[in-house]
Amino acid sequence: PGTVRALALAHERYGKLPWATLFEPAITLAEQGFVISPRLATLLAKDPYLAGDPDARAYFYQADGTPKTAGTRLTNPALARVLRTLASDGPDAFYRGPLAEAMVAKVHAHPTNPGVLSAADLASYQAKLRDGLCFDYRQSEICGFPTPSSGTIALGQIFGMLESRDMAALKPVQGEQGQLAASSEAIHLYSEAARLAFADRNQYVADVVDVPVTGLLDKGYLAQRGHLIGNRSMGVAQP
């Protein structure tokens, strides 16, 4: 839900085109639709949850109850109407009024996983400018989004745990379809580092306050974590 405010802030500070103009390509795509690809059709056929949501079922399923197939044109007139409202009325229309009320009602009425989002949550939300989070990896500096996002912290931990490994020596191998694929050793090392990084993420990264970012990206700490990676799967990683 924060995306609209973030886009509005970016437009306010850096935009050149009128706000409403930015919505035109997305509105056109939502109204005219796109052709479902074989990959999307396969995902729809395998998804166990969409059919349980009336709105998702109406969007992704045919009248006979089967998922829409490859080659079918998928349109989204409801999304087009929302985008037209935002284009004409501005970002506040997303956080107050009918759209906000509909979002809150939908969250509360979810049949299996109802949420606690409130109208006050939406109305009070403000986008914030934050300094990027950067870390060193070999001869490079890599930067990404800081907290409350956890992605850059996790990536920095994975890279830090693997920095002592000669990853360049783990050359790609030929896949079954003739394509290049990562070697089993490279996959193992990355997977184990990711297990450890996500264990820390789940333990330490939540609200933006009091996240120990410096400690999580400390080279000495990551070297210790990296030593936990052996030749076999560690199973469930611990923070």
Enumerate the predicted regions with their spans.
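Noncatalytic scaffold domains of N-terminal-nucleophile
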Residues: P1-R96, A100-S150, M167, H227-R232
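Gly/Pro-rich active-site capping loops and adjacent beta-alpha segments
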Residues: P1-Y14, G151-H188
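Low-complexity, intrinsically disordered regions enriched in charged/polar residues
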Residues: P38, V116-A119, T152, V211, ...
